[in-house]
Swiss-Prot record:
The keyword Oxidoreductase applies. Transmembrane segments: none annotated. Keywords: Oxidoreductase. One of its GO terms (molecular function) is oxidoreductase activity. Belongs to the oxidoreductase OpS7 family. The keyword Oxidoreductase applies. It comes from Hypocrea virens (strain Gv29-8 / FGSC 10586). This is Probable oxidoreductase virH. Probable oxidoreductase; part of the gene cluster that mediates the biosynthesis of virensols and trichoxide, fungal natural products that contain or are derived from a salicylaldehyde core. The pathway begins with the synthesis of the reduced chain in virensol C by the highly reducing polyketide synthase virA via condensation of one acetate and 8 malonate units. VirA has interesting programming rules since the first 2 ketides are fully reduced, the 3 following ketides undergo beta-dehydration, and the last 3 ketides are only reduced to beta-hydroxys to yield the trihydroxy portion. Pathway: Secondary metabolite biosynthesis.
């Protein structure tokens, strides 16, 4: 139970119930996230970034620089052009380039490339899958759901809540320059769990955003 003083220190939006949906939308409907299962059993997300949305046109519909320290991330473009920043190098990727791997521990981000003339559609997933506290459906649903609810409530997202969601799924925000992984993890652990979790009462996951398999009943 969140205390009144915690709400006063760090207000939070009313959470939308999206746990049972097969897809979700990001801020201002800039991007669609579809949760899929491939024939080989892999969990993937198909993202569609709509070219006519201002956030997409300005290259702002993707995430900031970050690291997944447990897993490699993979991208496969189906339509359009994606820009990928990978350890200081910028890639321009289309469906002809096949699957692009971003190894675990690599600073990276992605966006709709300026040369795009159509909606950007791509699949993204992480491996190995099935790890505890890793890049998975829970991570995306909580991260995107929380940011969208903040936008709808005209409220700035809490950096401590964002860090808690991310750290709990082995993901770290990172500056554009190299910083030792041990230092990033130490600082963000304190900000996420000590301040975000213990002091402010945030959780890494909410039942409105995500429910474990087998517990998908309507709320």
């Amino acid at each position: 139970m969140v205390c009144a003083w915690q709400l006063w220190l760090s207000p939070r939006p009313k959470r939308s119930v999206i746990a049972s949906g097969s897809h979700i939308y990001s801020n201002d409907d800039a991007a669609l996230f579809e949760f899929l299962k491939e024939d080989d059993g892999r969990w993937v997300v198909r993202e569609t970034h709509y070219i006519n949305n201002p956030l997409v046109k300005n290259g702002l519909s993707g995430p900031p620089l970050h690291i997944h320290w447990k897993q490699a991330e993979y991208f496969k473009v189906e339509q359009g052009v994606i820009g990928i920043h990978k350890n200081g190098k910028q890639l321009r990727v289309t469906k002809d380039d096949g699957v692009i791997e971003v190894p675990a521990g690599t600073r990276h981000k992605f966006w709709s490339h300026p040369s795009n003339q159509e909606d950007l559609v791509f699949k993204v997933w992480a491996e190995p899958q099935g790890l505890d506290h890793s890049f998975d459906e829970k991570f995306i649903r909580n991260l995107i759901g929380y940011q969208r609810d903040c936008k709808m409530a005209n409220m700035a997202p809490s950096v401590f809540q964002l860090m808690l969601i991310c750290y709990d799924c082995a993901t770290l925000a990172t500056p554009p320059f190299w910083v030792p992984l041990w230092l990033l993890t130490s600082i963000q652990y304190v900000l996420a769990y000590w301040i975000g979790g213990h002091l402010l009462g945030y959780k890494p996951s909410y039942s409105e955003y995500y429910r474990e398999p087998g517990d998908k009943k309507t709320m």
